[in-house]
Amino acid sequence: MQNIRNFSIIAHIDHGKSTLADRMLEFTNTVEKRKMKDQVLDQMELERERGITIKMQPVRMRYAHSNGPGPEEEYTLNLIDTPGHIDFSYEVSRALKAVEGAILLVDATQGVQAQTLTTLAMARELGLKIIPALNKIDSPLARVDEIKAEVVETLGCLPEDVLEVSGKTGSGVEELLEEVIKKIPAPKRELENEKDFRGLIFDFQYSDHKGIIVFVRVFDGEVKKNDKLVFSQAKEKFICLEAGIFSPEAVPKATLSAGEIGYIVTGIKKPGIASVGDTVLFANSNTQTLGGYMKPSPVVWASVYPESQDDFADLARALDKLQLTDSSFSYEEEASGLLGRGFRIGFLGTLHMEIFVERLHREFSVEVIVTTPSIMYDIKSKNGKTQRIYSPSLFPDFGDIESIQEPWVDIEVITPNDYMSPIMQLLFEHEAEQGDSDVFGDGRIKMHAQLPLRELMRGFFDKLKSVSAGYASVSYKIGEMRHADVARLDILVAEEIVPAFTKVVSKKRLEEEAQSSVEKLYKVLPRQMFVAKIQAQALGRIISSKTLSALKKDVTGHLYGGDITRKMKLREKQKKGKKKMKERGKVNIPQDIFLKMMKS
């Protein structure tokens, strides 16, 4: 155990964490040069396409290190690569509980970001040893001295404690690994009896052949093939079919011992048995369980329906399987008069939702209709009853509502001084209450504010990047519930409400949102064989309306000559047919239209 080091890398999105991990794998010969590719640890196709880490990924490296004049010693370095985006911070928190230290990686061209501070606070709370490092020092835009001063101020460390590396060229990687060995403590057993086994589940995945495969950090004892084990929470007993490590692919091992990070194949194929934060013990053991994780609460909700109701069972199976690889979303069945049976699903953010929908399509070939994302509201009706509403389409009629409460968020924005004015304007436009501001390093400022969660989800992140030329960053945490002056906005197509387009908006922006939604739908909705109105309705009245003209079909094209009477009869017949279609017709809305409106 003395020669094991377990660590993670804390970094904001796009600060080069995965690239640095690539260089570590290369330097330690964990991956052969001929097999090297960018983002080796990003296993999902989506991660590679988007250039972001979505799922954490553990890997074991071997590294020979000299402690002095004597012979070199071999060390086992277990790295857990983690996501940098705020929507996947739960993945990061789980990784941090399985390690003893973390590298705080800061982009030398960008500086310390707000989300990095949030993750750093989590690491410090867990008592992890922090090793600061500046990345991208080879960039001509690097401001090494300036950013190093920021890191020193943030951590309270010395300038010489901050290492300088380049994930691109590999410069400084050897020194960084040496620092990991010197400064991050070796793992320690917690139980007196060395034969008692305890493993913390920090992630799991599902295999059609092997069943549930749990990713574990072994805190005490050891486990091997054919050992009888139990999930302490579910009380489900099973036989260890295989134990092993990640290198970075799964490699079976005779035993998995205290201090190590690896996997256990359970053979269990039932959903809902394994859970992140559970402890794996020997069957019939009375050993105390390890402290688990606090499950995150969803931030946004959306209803998801199969494009065809014949595919409902396929969607249900897909959700069961997805939850075996992503335990951070929650779902329950619901029904809509227009869209049929579906599920209301809670996500950690809008990016989490986008990735989820994309995975449904790619991994399970399920085409879905997704409603406009929403947050939760507490609504008190005039009859005195209070209910928590997650779907805008379930909002009561405006005349029945006594009051509405919504969650607010506390946000922290870090920005160069030059962009403070447009950011203050952006905060004003999103109904924020501005708080204190503090100087943060040389030429930057840290701003505090509070605003409604619905306003944060209304494109705030993208707008912040836009007004600050990409230099500002933001982190947030859910705060208190407050009074909400909002209304339900329905979109009607051919005089029928389409629940998927219903949203809750501020009364101040009701007309603006109504016109914007109608205009966008008008532009993307294919024309029908009959005239169809697109309308926005709120507070009992139509606020905006536009008419989609009918698709013209030449019913006289097959006629020759100048029989005008025959042509007139055919056109009159077509007119009557379109009138009937309009009276009874439902507009066919393709699935991609729902996705386009969801992003509006």
Segments from the language model and where they lie:
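Structural and coupling elements of P-loop NTPases
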Residues: 1-600
